[in-house]
Amino acid sequence: MEQQSENVYFSGSESESLSDSESRAQPQNQNSDNSRSASLTPPDSSDLEDYVDSDSETSSSLVNAPKRIKIIRSPSTSNWPRRLTSDDNGSDDDSEDEDESNDEQDLVESEEEDQRSRSSSRSAMDISSEEDSGDDEPSFTLTELPGDVPDFKVYNRNIAIFSIKYLNQFGRLNAGIQETDFPTAKLVNTNRHVVVWINMLENDTTPVTPDSFDSFNLSGAIILKDSSGLIEYMYVHKNSRTVKSLLLDAIATIYNQVTGNDILINIWTQNINIDEDVRFLVNYGFVEPAIVGKNTIQMKYHPKIPHQQTLNEIRRLLGYSKRNVGWINVFLPKDLAIKLFSYVNNYDVEFGGYLPLTSVQKPNGAWVLGWDDTLVSKGESLSVYIPPPQEHQKLEETIIGFHTHPIALSSSNTISDGMVILPPSNIDLKGISNQWLFPRPNIAHFICSPEGLWVVSLTEEFQSLLMGLRDLGEVAWPCINMILFVIFESMFQQHDQKFNYPTVTPITKWFELTDVQDLIKNLTLKRCFNYLNIPMEKFEATCQTISGYQNVRLYDISYNKWESFSALPDEGLYFTFYYKYDDFTGYPRQKSLTTEASN
């Protein structure tokens, strides 16, 4: 996506180096009518000398990077987990509980893919075995005791459940959990159980016993507090939906049915994957969300309550928990998804424009997105021009933007197998970000590709940074230029090194879909500067506005298969987007653009 004076261009499937794209825009008076231009010219080599050491290779590579990229990456296992659960238990009175928790990785789609990843690479829990030197050998109870949770039990062949007091008997699992952010003090507390996914090949007949348990590869675990039924920790390697469901099935069967107690889970609201995670948990049967502590929403397992009712309540709670931030709930129906996919599948050029909010609202207050031919522009094979919002256009017509990545842009060897990947490019992110320097930016932008629908938006923190620089006027343009340059140049180079698939296979497609989301979700200014070997301290001295923003995430992104529009009861998908409001952007100073949704 490339932006000019009063123009917004969206690029095609290939990422492009900012240093190779011509800048057609120069800073203009921000008060000029319909002005959406920005000086996005990358700093030249003389400018970079202010920030790059003379012996660094970055100063030349930044301005001479190739325009066309080749992306290559070998599948590898991720590090030990970052979790979706929160330790802030509300009524739970464990003194060692902490508020801080990391985020869980993106969810994957099938058990078959998860088995491929496990068989082709070491599990994230596959840590060197350690001998236990304890003198007392515990005795394991392999039968259920009435009204009690068993000390050790194998459930559904691939899952083991045992008391945490025996954790030190399993060196590999113990070492793996020790490397996480789970509070060590809780590991010696005996009123907890561990539920673990065991990697077993289909033809493996080795029985799972306390003696053989630690010889298996392990790639999923839940830590459950017995007294309250609270899931304190949850992780699945590559976050397979199937494995997560099986782990929860085991808890529902062994804990809920045996003890009769409720199962609770705490969600950390700062989790970068919260939309995907809560959707999974709600679909599984977790309901009745309530705020129980700082940045913590608690849900209870109760599969009979309608899923959508719970999702709507979570969105409402999340919206009210954010300060000086408005939000909007939208619904993209199946018929609109079919229309968008037809532009991906049937044309060899890009289309782009806006998806207006219709006058129709769902019972929960979400606005239904529609289609207006007058808001859609036809582009070229690798770009599309989207006119900026005009004064005569209503606000609800231009809140949500979109553009297509047609299947024709992909190479012929992938089209024949249906293995097409055209994710958001660094130039797409450039244009989406640049809009926040001008009135009425897109609150969210949909990128329609053969593999599915990508949804990109700026985090509230990145919105605040750009809006603050915008308010400083022309004096801030060099700072803005440098920020955008390092973000998109680092994106370009990381794509170049990580995501090149000459022939896309189901396995490489799955890895790229996961890794693209991971890369974009975890972008921060500090990581971008470090990746390009540019000392951030020198830049911060001349651009003090970025102080406090070095480690904030820049983007939110989600990926949705086209098939998912038919899989849900409403035959469509709900989205919630958050925005910083002020007079310049034109968005209202109210807590929600959808009145009913905020009640």
UniProtKB/Swiss-Prot annotation:
Residues 1-146 are annotated as: Disordered. Residues 1-10, 24-44 have a biased composition (Polar residues). Residues 46-56, 89-114, 128-138 have a biased composition (Acidic residues). Residues 11-20, 118-127 have a biased composition (Low complexity). Belongs to the IIV-6 229L family. This is Uncharacterized protein 229L.
